[in-house]
Each structure stands twice: as structure tokens, then as C-alpha cells.
Amino acid sequence: MKEIEDITDIKLFVNEFYEKVKNDILIGPVFLEKIPGDWQPHLDKMHAFWNAALFGVPGFKGNPFAKHAPLKINAEHFDRWLELFDETIDNHFEGYMAEDTKNRAKLMAGMFLSRLQKMNGEHNKVVF
């Protein structure tokens, strides 16, 4: 196993992760409804997002929360997303950057869930 070092590593974990997502019984249908056809534009955007988040490389443009706000997702969906994400990272990588990547994903998921719950008038029920 190795550290996450560059865009090649990012592409590996992003592509494998979203294959798992598409085939997952809980979160797969949510993603497949939103992205019914060609996934490459989404994958390219996620490559750029993680490259910016982890290595400060410019190139990501977008508002990730705005894309998730209209979806019917809850804590169970976020927990499953994180489970698949962590599993993917752990299958290929170790070290500081692997842990940092998982921590960033967890922070982002928690923020998204909290904002969605506030939008829906729910109390904060973060489960992670």
C-alpha cells in the first residue's frame, strides 16, 4: 500500500468509489437517478475537486452542496457513502494523506447533512 500522491491516485480512488456507489442498493438509485447516462463529466469534476482539496491544484469549479440539496438523502445515505469511501481508500492507500482524505470526506458529509437537516427543519441528527 502507498500514500495518495497525485492525480493518478485520485482518479483510482474516485473511479473505484463511484463504481461501488452505482452498484450500492441504498445510495446507487439516488446517484443513478441524478446521473442516468454518461458518468465521465461527474468523474472529471470529482477528480478536480479532490485534486484541489488535497493538493491545492486549481481547476475545480462548482458548488457541491447545491448539487446535493435537492436530493432525498438522510444520515443513512451519508453513512453508507462514507463507508464505501473509506473502504475504497483503505483498499489502496495508507498514511497521512489517506487519513486526511477520509477525514475531509467525513467533515464534508457532516456539513452537508447538517445543512440539509436545517433546510428541512430537522434537528441535527448526525450519526457518524
Language-model-derived ranges and their functions:
Residues 1-128:
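Core of compact, soluble alpha-helical bundle domains
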